[in-house]
Design a protein with these regions (language model features):
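Active-site helical microenvironments for divalent-metal-assisted chemistry
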Residues: 2-164
C-alpha cells in the first residue's frame, strides 16, 4: 500500500527492514535490535513518523563505524520510507565526525534538518548507552540534550521519558 506522502505504511516499512536485515550483526547484538531501539526511542519521544522511520533505517547505507553486509538501494529505501526520511538517512550515513558535524552544524543544515539529525542521533546514542557504561557517551548525550532543548521546546517536555 502506497501512502500519499510517497511512502509505504509504517508496518510495511518495519517488515521490509526486518526481512532485509534479519541476520545482520551490529557489535555484540543484531542490527535489527539496535535500529528498532532507535525507532522506539523516537516514537516514545513523540517524533513524527518520518523521523521515526529515518531512525529505523538510520545506518542502512553504512556509516563511519558500521558497514552492513546487506545493501539497499536509495530507490528502494525511498519507496518505503519516503523522500524526506531517505534524505535524512543518506545524510546521517555520509557524515564524517558525526557528533561534531551535527552538534556544531558544520554543514549548515537548515533548522529543521539539523533538529531532525539531532533527534535521530540522540536516539541512536541513547540506544547504545543502554548496553554500554561509557562516561564519554553519557557526556555526549548531555550535549545532545542541551542542543535539542535550545532548538525544540517540545524536547524539554519529552526528554525525561528515557533517563540517561
Amino acid at each position: 500500500m502506497q501512502l500519499l506522502n510517497n511512502m509505504k505504511s509504517e508496518q510495511e516499512c518495519i517488515e521490509y527492514f526486518v526481512s532485509s536485515f534479519l541476520d545482520e550483526q551490529h557489535g555484540n547484538d543484531y542490527f535489527i535490535a539496535h535500529c528498532m531501539g532507535v525507532y522506539t526511542i523516537l516514537k516514545q519521544m513523540g517524533s513524527p513518523l518520518e523521523i521515526c522511520l529515518a531512525g529505523l533505517y538510520h545506518s542502512v547505507y553504512g556509516t563511519e563505524n558500521f558497514t552492513p553486509v546487506t545493501r539497499l538501494t536509495k530507490h528502494t529505501v525511498k519507496e518505503y520510507i519516503g523522500d524526506r526520511s531517505e534524505d535524512l538517512v543518506s545524510t546521517f550515513c555520509s557524515l564524517k565526525n558525526r557528533d561534531i558535524s551535527i552538534l556544531k552544524n558544520l554543514n549548515n543544515y537548515n533548522d529543521r534538518k539539523r533538529k531532525d539529525l539531532l533527534y535521530i542521533n540522540y536516539a541512536n546514542l541513547m540506544d547504545q548507552s543502554q548496553s554500554l557504561d561509557d562516561p564519554k557517551l553519557k557526556s555526549l548525550l548531555t550535549e545532545y540534550q542541551s542542543a535539542l532543548s535550545s532548538t525544540s521546546p517540545v524536547f524539554n517536555d519529552t526528554k525525561n521519558i528515557i533517563e540517561i
